[in-house]
């Protein structure tokens, strides 16, 4: 697995792309600016398997709609507490931004994960879910091997 990190233009949040080169698939954590994500997917000849959200503030989700337009069968993972922010500009805070339009995720189906959930990235790689409330009550962290997101 190769991990790519991109710093986004909105609030300098980070997006991570996990490329599983053998399978030709990738997973994205906290999609922001989509140009570097699409470039990374193309350069690694990978299709998007899923999107993982640490929480649902706007600066961590604003690339979601563009990704699901290109990869409609990809899965979306979020905590139950953060799921309200997918569809509420008030809860994802985009409503209060002077620079952006109110944002809503258009993908209606998502998978709620919580503490001790495990997400199979492929047959060999499993991502562990850790609840880390604080910045947002629905915050999640993801762990795989030595990597923590």
PLM feature spans:
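Active-site HxH/HxHxD metal-binding segment of metal-dependent hydrolases
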Residues: 33-123
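Catalytic core of the metallo-beta-lactamase
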Residues: 1-46, 103-149
């Amino acid at each position: 697995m190769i991990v790519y990190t991109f710093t986004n233009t909105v609030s300098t949040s980070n997006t991570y792309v996990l490329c599983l080169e053998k399978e030709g698939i990738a997973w994205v954590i906290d999609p922001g600016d989509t140009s570097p994500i699409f470039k990374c997917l193309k350069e690694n000849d990978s299709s998007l398997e899923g999107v993982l959200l640490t929480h649902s503030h706007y600066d961590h989700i604003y690339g979601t709609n563009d990704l699901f337009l290109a990869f409609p069968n990809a899965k979306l993972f979020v905590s139950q507490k953060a799921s309200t922010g997918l569809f509420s500009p008030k809860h994802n805070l985009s409503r209060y931004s002077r620079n952006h339009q109110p944002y809503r995720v258009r993908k209606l189906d998502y998978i709620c994960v919580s503490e001790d959930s495990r997400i199979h990235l492929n047959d060999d790689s499993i991502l562990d879910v850790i609840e880390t409330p604080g910045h947002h009550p629905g915050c999640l962290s993801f762990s795989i091997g030595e990597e923590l997101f």
